[in-house]
Regions:
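Charge-dense, low-complexity intrinsically disordered segments
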Residues: 1, 90, 118, 122
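An alpha-helical appendage that flanks or caps ligand/catalytic pockets
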Residues: 2-108, 136
Length: 139
């Protein structure tokens, strides 16, 4: 919600300049891509833990993933994660492609800044490979 409000205000209040004739929106998007939806959910649990730790006043390095992490959370914690991770997608290539396309359409962003906060380096590289393979590009 806050992102969409910021984009609306930016576009409404934009004043052309020598550097930029029209509004140009860049939006950050978290992607947790893997070969299966289950693996992607597992990988995403590192970021989920990290965000909750930060909210609890206990910041630190990105923790390792935990199987079925969200099953241990309260309804309030799940609501916090839904809000914080509303600019993200997780899943296999088809799921990620759809999530990126939906976010790009919803925001009308001219450019996406994609990140993949995955604990394991090789899994993070695989996530970025999948992101590159799905190749969402604005026409």
């Amino acid at each position: 919600v806050a992102l969409m409000q910021a984009i609306e205000i930016y576009r409404a209040e934009f004043k052309p300049s020598e550097q930029l004739a029209a509004p140009y929106v860049m939006a950050g998007f978290n992607v947790f891509a893997a070969d299966s939806d289950e693996e992607a959910d597992y990988l995403r649990s590192s970021s989920q833990q990290s965000f909750l730790n930060l909210r609890r006043g206990d910041p630190g390095p990105l923790p390792p993933p935990v199987k079925d992490f969200t099953e241990t959370l309260s309804a309030a914690e799940l609501q916090v994660l839904d809000s914080i991770l509303s600019c993200s997608t997780a899943g296999r290539p088809e799921t990620v492609r759809a999530g990126i396309a939906e976010f790009a359409e919803r925001t009308g962003a001219d450019e996406l800044i994609v990140t993949s906060h995955v604990y394991d380096h090789d899994k993070r590289l695989r996530s970025f490979e999948i992101i590159a393979e799905v190749g969402i590009a604005k026409d």
